[in-house]
């Protein structure tokens, strides 16, 4: 095998060639096309959709950053909490199994959560436009489970936030059900300084991990 020169290695790095080949191989493994060469040609013509995970602690600004990035890149924004809730309500075999855990007040296993997420990421809009998943995976077990399902993002962004700052942001959150608006008593107070409901955690579903 030929030894690559420094110039060649630099070129490969600048043009993201290793990532390109990795994505081609991942798509082939996922779709198992009958004619791989024709499949690769078609994939290159239509482009490889972006696949992004953004995770972080509560109060780290995931929702705001995800919306900004999704709008800029034109990818489908997928909230993990909404996917899990709607997945349970969809009536599929997987969702019915998840519902059996929820109805007993038990934690839905990570492998089952990853299957529900994979189903959503396999839908036509996400496949065509690419996707950005907000708030998933939430732990190492979920990361391993979703990888075993064949979902490997091109980019994983972790929003780091000190625990005391996370608590400060959550402590002062308020939600007004009359206007369906969220406020922060220090940074973005409601008109008149009053708001009926205090929200101390994101609405992501306590029954899911």
UniProtKB/Swiss-Prot annotation:
Keywords: ATP-binding, Cytoplasm, Kinase, Nucleotide-binding, Transferase
LID as annotated region, ranges: 172-205
One GO CC term on file: cytoplasm
Positions of region (NMP): 79-108
Localization: Cytoplasm
Binding site for AMP: 80, 106-108, 135-138, 142
Pfam families: ADK
Keyword field contains Translocase: no
EC number: 2.7.4.3
InterPro entries, alphabetized: Adenylat/UMP-CMP_kin, P-loop_NTPase
Lineage: superkingdom: Eukaryota
GO MF annotation, one: adenylate kinase activity
Residues that bind ATP: 59-64, 173
Class of the enzyme per the UniProt entry, highest EC level: transferase
Catalysis: reaction(s): AMP + ATP = 2 ADP
Function summary: Catalyzes the reversible transfer of the terminal phosphate group between ATP and AMP. Plays an important role in cellular energy homeostasis and in adenine nucleotide metabolism.
Recorded family membership: Belongs to the adenylate kinase family.
Oligomer status and interactors: Monomer.
Protein name: Adenylate kinase
Natural source organism: Trypanosoma brucei rhodesiense
């Amino acid at each position: 095998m030929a030894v690559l020169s420094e110039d060649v290695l630099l070129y490969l790095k600048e043009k993201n060639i290793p990532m390109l080949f990795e994505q081609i191989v991942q798509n082939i493994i996922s779709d198992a096309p009958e004619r791989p060469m024709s499949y690769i040609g078609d994939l290159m013509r239509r482009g490889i959709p972006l696949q992004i995970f953004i995770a972080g602690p509560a109060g780290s600004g995931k929702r705001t950053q995800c919306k900004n990035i999704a709008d800029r890149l034109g990818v489908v924004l997928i909230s993990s909490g909404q996917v899990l809730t709607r997945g349970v309500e969809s009536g599929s075999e997987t969702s019915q199994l998840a519902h059996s855990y929820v109805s007993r007040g038990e934690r839905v296993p990570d492998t089952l959560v990853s299957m529900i997420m994979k189903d959503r990421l396999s839908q036509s809009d996400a496949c065509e436009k690419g996707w950005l998943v907000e708030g998933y995976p939430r732990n190492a077990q979920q990361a391993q489970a979703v990888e075993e399902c064949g979902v490997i993002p091109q980019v994983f962004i972790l929003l780091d936030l000190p625990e005391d700052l996370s608590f400060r942001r959550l402590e002062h959150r308020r939600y007004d059900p009359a206007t369906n608006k969220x406020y922060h008593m220090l940074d973005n107070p409601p008109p008149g300084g009053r708001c009926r409901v205090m929200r101390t955690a994101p609405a992501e579903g306590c029954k899911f991990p």
